[in-house]
Amino acid sequence: MMASMRVVKELEDLQKKPPPYLRNLSSDDANVLVWHALLLPDQPPYHLKAFNLRISFPPEYPFKPPMIKFTTKIYHPNVDENGQICLPIISSENWKPCTKTCQVLEALNVLVNRPNIREPLRMDLADLLTQNPELFRKNAEEFTLRFGVDRPS
């Protein structure tokens, strides 16, 4: 009950004043603990398209962190092939119940725009970004153009 009340309030707040990097924020009709959103990164190579997200809140929220998953494929060292994200702010050891979803989404936007090669989920992409940044950016741009979602106007 507490989780849904807080989640509803956070959703309403974000819908009233959405950050510039987020669009189409909504919850599942049947479950307010599941949100969908469109992330619009502003840095190359990800700025060319947008990416669908699914945000799932556990019943224990805010005492347990939400889970965020990319449902659009993304070529990124901190996102695995299944869309799972390595985002320190929502890790069990770092999570604080006072953290709001808007802060989590801001951290995600920063991470997408500036990959963290110290905590990769895809070591191959972290290595490529370190050893050959131009090739990484070229591959990421091609992947983004192929799999990304058109950005809303």
Curated annotation (Swiss-Prot):
Keywords: Transferase, Ubl conjugation, Ubl conjugation pathway
Tissue specificity annotation: Present in natural killer cells (at protein level).
Induction (record text): By IFNB1/IFN-beta.
UniProt pathway: Protein modification; protein ubiquitination
Cross-referenced Pfam families: UQ_con
Molecular function terms from GO: ISG15 transferase activity; ubiquitin binding; ubiquitin conjugating enzyme activity; ubiquitin-protein transferase activity
Reactions this protein catalyses: S-ubiquitinyl-[E1 ubiquitin-activating enzyme]-L-cysteine + [E2 ubiquitin-conjugating enzyme]-L-cysteine = [E1 ubiquitin-activating enzyme]-L-cysteine + S-ubiquitinyl-[E2 ubiquitin-conjugating enzyme]-L-cysteine
Gene Ontology cellular-component terms listed: cytoplasm; cytosol; nucleoplasm; nucleus
The protein's name in its UniProt record: Ubiquitin/ISG15-conjugating enzyme E2 L6
